[in-house]
Amino acid sequence: MSNVPADLKYTDEHEWIRTEADGTLTVGITDHAQSTLGDIVFLELPAVGKSVSAGDAVGVVESVKAASDIYSPVSGEIIAINEEAADSPEEVNSDAYGVWLFKIKLADGASTDKLIDADAYGKLID
């Protein structure tokens, strides 16, 4: 089984989400996702300031085997992207939970209720 940290939330599309002290959300792809994709060679990240809805495709991760969309886990505004990850996408393979992709501020009235916990995500990928 892949590594699934208990302190994070997850999506069915294999993104991980960490809620920061200021209420913003930090998003990356899971260890299972990077393992399935193989050697990651390119990341296309969303534009800072972009408003997105939950489930929107906001970026792309490309590996030597495949390309996969990155989805927004919630509705909100992209407030930061990880330029270092875009410049060195292979780092996601070595530290999927340490390398974040983007940060998002929840839209008014938006919720994290549809995110799943580590136990549910672990069952999803087993």
Swiss-Prot record:
Subunit structure: The glycine cleavage system is composed of four proteins: P, T, L and H.
InterPro entries: 2-oxoA_DH_lipoyl-BS, Biotin_lipoyl, GCV_H, GCV_H/Fam206, GCV_H_sub, Single_hybrid_motif
Cofactor note: Binds 1 lipoyl cofactor covalently.
Lipoyl-binding domain ranges (all copies): 24-105
Domain of life (superkingdom): Bacteria
Record function comment: The glycine cleavage system catalyzes the degradation of glycine. The H protein shuttles the methylamine group of glycine from the P protein to the T protein.
Keywords: Lipoyl
Signal peptide range in chain numbering: none
Record's keyword annotation contains Lipid metabolism: no
Family per record: Belongs to the GcvH family.
CDD domains: GCS_H
BP GO annotations: glycine decarboxylation via glycine cleavage system
Pfam families linked to this entry: GCV_H (PF01597)
Known cofactor(s): (R)-lipoate
Any one cellular-component term (Gene Ontology): glycine cleavage complex
Species, as recorded: Burkholderia ambifaria (strain MC40-6)
N6-lipoyllysine: modified positions: K65
Protein name: Glycine cleavage system H protein
Record keyword Glycoprotein present: no
